[in-house]
Structures are given as structure tokens and as C-alpha cells.
Amino acid sequence: MFHSKLFLSLALVLFIAGCGGGTGFQPTITGVKPETLQYGKSATIYLGGKDLRSNMIVETNGACTNPSFASKSTTDTLVLNCTVKAVGDFTLTIKTEAGVVVNTTSLTVPKPQVGILTSLGSIVMELDPAAAPITVNNFLSYANSGFYSNTLFHRVMSGFVIQAGGYTTGMVKKEGQKDPIVLESNNGLSNLRGTVAMARTNVPDSATSEFFINHVDNLFLNYSTTSAGYAVFGKVLQGMDVVDAIAAKATGMLNGEKSLPLEEITITSAFQVK
């Protein structure tokens, strides 16, 4: 009787131990491979190893939010999804449910880039969300939704700026603009040649979709103690020859805009490329 009770007790212990949902071994991660790391978008990161579990803890210090493991994850490969909210280097830390660190990896998110295809050529802009997060997020939301397609460069002034993003053929204001954003002009960036800034009215917090590219250094547009200034949020990486070509076009008056190119210059598309 004693031996049978002992056998039954051991069997019960083994049964309880087997119901824990894991293998009982410490998980190990031997490789981390990001498939996509684009600012503002969902990232997919593959974690390879052994005895991996979908209840492990993910820490990114806010650089990649709402982490979750995809249903196709296995004990050999976890598929991590999260939303990228910062640029630059960040540390991805994976812990067990008990808080034991399994792996730390340094990952890098590049600054976002937007490609603008125009009737005169292509322009690539690099944006700076660290300096102007509200402005960059606003611009990307317009670009990624296709808002800028078929809008005009409606204000062209050689030696000053080229401006776009709010009107279609005939200087008709494009519908679908979002609420105005907070002005981020006091961010350390300067209105130098080739930089990109938001256009606005005389009211500081009034920018929506319109933006301009500085054709020359326009330091008087910067923030100062006496001027609200205009928020720079990026710069032209490629295509300053296109900017110069647009700025060189002859202009005239239409619907109150005295600097409208006589030859219509259209943005055919604008989209995030990085």
C-alpha cells in the first residue's frame, strides 16, 4: 500500500509539472532579424532560438509600442510586431515571464523619407521626428493617405520658396484637410536652402497640409523672441535640381495667388519610402 501511494503521488507531481505550458527549459535567443523598421509603421522582428514562449516580456523604452507576438510564432521562432515611434538606436530587451533577461539587442530606426513625384521630376525628403514629432506625423499622415496626389506647386518664388500641398487645378482648395497642428518652430532647425517647413496663416497654430521648400537660406523665417517663425521638419536629400527647375518657372496671378506657375506643376504622388 505504501509503494502504491508513493507511485500515485509521484504521478500527480509529474502531471502538475506538465501543465505549465512550457518545456521547463530556459528559453534562448540566438538571432534577431528585423524585417521592417520604418518610423510610424508596424515593424516585424523575427526572434530565433529555442524553447521560446509567446508570454515573454518585450521592452523597447517606448521606441516600438504595443508589442505582440504573431499567432504563427513557434518555440523556435517568435514573430514580434510593434509600432515604431522613434528614430535612432534603441535596445530591444526580451525577458521571461518571471523577469529574467533572455536577450538584449540594439536596433536602429532610420529617419523617415518621403518621395515626391512631380511633373518635373522626383524629390526625396528626409524628415526629423526627433525635432518636430507633431509636424512629421502630420505630414506623413497626409502623404501615406495619398492626399498630396494631384496637388499643385501653387506658390513659386525664385530666391525664396516653392510651396505646395493644398490646391488642385484652377487653384481649387483640396478637401480632406485635417485639424491644424501646434507650431513646432522652436526646435533648433533652421530655414536653410533645401529644408522643408510647414506653411501657415498669421496664426501660429494653423498649419494643415501645405508645406514649402526653402530655395535659399531664409533665416528670417526662423523662430525668435519676436517672431513665431515657421517649423522646419526635414530637408531635401535628392532632387534639389528639381526644386531649382520649379523655382525657375514663370508665374502669374490666379484666384488671388500672384506666384502661380503659368505651366502647371503637379505632385503626381507622395509616399513614405523609408
Please place each PLM-identified region on the residue numbering:
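Cyclophilin-like peptidyl-prolyl cis-trans isomerases
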Residues: 19-274
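Bacterial N-terminal signal peptides that target proteins for export
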Residues: 1-8
